[in-house]
Amino acid sequence: ILSALPGKASTVSAEIPYQTFRDFAENKGVFTPGVTGIEIKDNNGNAVGTLDVPMIDFSSVSRRGSLTLLSQGYGVSAKHGGLGDVNNASFGYDKNNYTVVKNNKHSGLDFSLHRFSKLITEAAPADINISGQLSDSSQYTAFYRAGAGTQYIKERSGKQTHIPGTFLTGGTVGTPWYSGNNLISSSPGDTYNKSQGPLASYGQMGDSGSPLFAYDSLSEKWSLAGVTLHNNGVNGQKKQLVVIT
């Protein structure tokens, strides 16, 4: 059973430049939306993996990482920890701020839908047209996330080092499994397991509401799979998300 610790930011590999995870979440450098075959290199410049699917456009993710744009006027997040009562959110490289005029909190699930005072034009809304089972690795061939807050880098020994500052970072997540009640779980805290991809990213305390995106190899599109709810501790491996449909 996962503990009720809200996720915040992420734990990532200490063997890959930290800037790589920041560039990934902000679509900077080689991480241009639509580009395929992006080679990931470690601190010594050695190739450690390749991102084979078209790079996602993360512009739908708010600068704080806890809200994702679903249309030009609405965004989705978790409900707990005050996320169901947000007043504003910012998007884009210019960090333009938008006022939330209505918060709609789901009565039974831990997620919330927010309406903005005006249309947001500098960000591309996420798709939520999920078909089939997210656990079907033949259809959903990649999972990416982004979030912001307290950061850690993790060595193979398990030692974690805190990185000061607040940054939007992102990375890869292994194929999730269903855990009941519209929930899915994954194990991106198993940082050096190849099943988590070359840029494994594990949400930490405060990252609640941050998105998980799934790449559908049949439709060749990225969709919002769910938003982060909890993890099983700073040194844990698993996290839990609510599926957005």
Regions found by a protein language model. Give the residues of each.
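Sec-dependent N-terminal signal peptides
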Residues: 1-3
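C-terminal subregion of chymotrypsin/trypsin-like serine protease catalytic domains
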Residues: 5-47, 57, 63-82, 167-197, ...
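Short, solvent-exposed loop/turn elements at domain surfaces
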Residues: 30, 78, 84-87, 123, ...
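Short strand-coil-strand connectors
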Residues: 59-65, 92-96, 126-129
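Cell wall/extracellular polymer interaction/catalysis modules
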Residues: 59-61, 101-102, 112-116
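Catalytic-histidine neighborhood of serine endopeptidases
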Residues: 71-72, 76-109
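Short conserved beta-strand and strand-loop elements enriched in small hydrophobics
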Residues: 83-96, 139-148, 214
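Chymotrypsin/trypsin-fold serine protease catalytic domain
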Residues: 108-206, 228-233
